Amino acid sequence: MDAFATSPTSALIKAVNCIAHVTPMAGEDSSENRRASNYKPSTWDYEFLQSLATSHNTVQEKHMKMAEKLKEEVKSMIKGQMEPVAKLELINILQRLGLKYRFESEIKEELFSLYKDGTDAWWVDNLHATALRFRLLRENGIFVPQDVFETLKDKSGKFKSQLCKDVRGLLSLYEASYLGWEGEDLLDEAKKFSTTNLNNVKESISSNTLGRLVKHALNLPLHWSAARYEARWFIDEYEKEENVNPNLLKYAKLDFNIVQSIHQQELGNLARWWVETGLDKLSFVRNTLMQNFMWGCAMVFEPQYGKVRDAAVKQASLIAMVDDVYDVYGSLEELEIFTDIVDRWDITGIDKLPRNISMILLTMFNTANQIGYDLLRDRGFNGIPHIAQAWATLCKKYLKEAKWYHSGYKPTLEEYLENGLVSISFVLSLVTAYLQTEILENLTYESAAYVNSVPPLVRYSGLLNRLYNDLGTSSAEIARGDTLKSIQCYMTQTGATEEAAREHIKGLVHEAWKGMNKCLFEQTPFAEPFVGFNVNTVRGSQFFYQHGDGYAVTESWTKDLSLSVLIHPIPLNEED
């Protein structure tokens, strides 16, 4: 069966387990006076996706045993004696292959040992070593000051001219510069210097492998990349290297396929849930289950976080529909009623809404309450008040944007972003993920409420998600008649051209990343994995909106990656 079809499958729809009776309204299905969304139907065949739950890629037992054996070999490799730069390069390869989560403690132990080593002769005056050391240490929570790059400057304070010929060093410097904080001017200089020189030489690099790495990095730096997506690309790339370690490559392929088989089962179960709700038949809203699962894998791909992915995908799929109701389909009166019901977390008054909108609302309630029940059963914590609060806050932000649209009000960029960093909806997913993963002794009503208050880490995550979304979707959304986005707000406020406005928003993206980077080192009540969730949702947005709206419209780049990450296992050699 093909993974794609021209329209969603006409599978049997089972009755949704609603908590209220929806009274039909006169003219409830009328499209009169409603704006057209112009959304294309999902290109994914839901019958095929459901089949993944039972006929997913079964990893053979011999491959599971082989993976365990190779894992021990790689662990010994990490702990083995080698030159410091070689150790850093091994760790870099492991991370890019998507294997960091398998060797978290070993990697941190080796990096901390290199950090404590008082000898600096191996990295000082070596651009590649200095930059790679800086990036890997910061990525793994060990602070290194930007001053380590001072030795690479000449007497005039500029980077030494001979460094322009060191392509590998420039690439490492480029990647390191994206971990900078606000006020770290030296790293800003490093970013400009490395970007300029890499662009100058990218077409004339003699090594094909290095040339591909440079072009890949210039398209998207590692720090902005989703680990699971990057791993799928890098496994193929690593196989082409002259000095490839066969056992490391084999383990990376096996582990990728093992995790993929788990993801396939999860996706199949989610597709069944989606079809059973009946929401896949609503044509006036986006049908985005597959995109949301890809996003869930960007947020957290590790096998042990299946419940986090499940809740995040369900909520995100409903969020897209609720967003469309507020942005395009619902009348202002209907949106007021919808918001009031969610704010009270009480379905009284739902009979005042059209059936289609009521279906979305009831599925939202049922899903949130089920997640809350699972939390109470599994963790002994009542999370429903916090999930309900996140939904209520989100709907109020949506309503504000709808009122702006209906009144013709044009917000300033600052006003728009203050509302938009919450209306982008990731606070809801992050609150739920926090409730699911926080250490139980630290999980309290107050700590959960703090996440809902949008503290700095969550704020930067929301801001970046909003900015990426606007860069990718604003043109299509304005054509549909949606609320003005950040680009249009800036144009209206300053008189700038669209091109200039886009450059300004891109500048805000770079600055917001600096704020996020600093948050990763500041004292907060949060720990892993929650900190990583915040950063990784942004990386998912970067992927979907890098070349346009790859979320609402299944573009070739999102479709191809979805197939390679979720559907097709990596081929193994016959002897494997």
UniProtKB/Swiss-Prot annotation:
Gene3D superfamilies: Farnesyl Diphosphate Synthase, Terpene synthase, N-terminal domain. Signal peptide: none annotated. GO terms for molecular function: magnesium ion binding; terpene synthase activity. Mg(2+) 2 binds at D323, D327. GO terms for biological process: diterpenoid biosynthetic process; geranyl diphosphate metabolic process. Mg(2+) 3 binds at N469, T473, E477. Binds 3 Mg(2+) or Mn(2+) ions per subunit. Keywords: Lyase, Magnesium, Manganese, Metal-binding. The keyword Iron-sulfur does not apply. A motif (DDXXD motif) lies at residues 323-327. Mg(2+) 1 binds at D323, D327. (2E)-geranyl diphosphate binds at R286, D323, D327, R466, N469. The keyword Ribonucleoprotein does not apply. It catalyses: (2E)-geranyl diphosphate + H2O = (R)-alpha-terpineol + diphosphate. Its EC number is 4.2.3.112. It holds the Pfam family Terpene_synth_C. Its cofactor is Mg(2+); Mn(2+). Belongs to the terpene synthase family. Tpsb subfamily. Monoterpene synthase producing mainly (+)-alpha-terpineol (44%) and (-)-limonene (33.6%) and lower amounts of (E)-geraniol (5.9%), linalool (5.0%), myrcene (3.4%), (-)-alpha-pinene (3.3%), (+)-sabinene (3.0%) and alpha-terpinolene (1.6%). This is (+)-alpha-terpineol synthase. The lineage of its organism: Eukaryota, Viridiplantae, Streptophyta, Embryophyta, Tracheophyta.
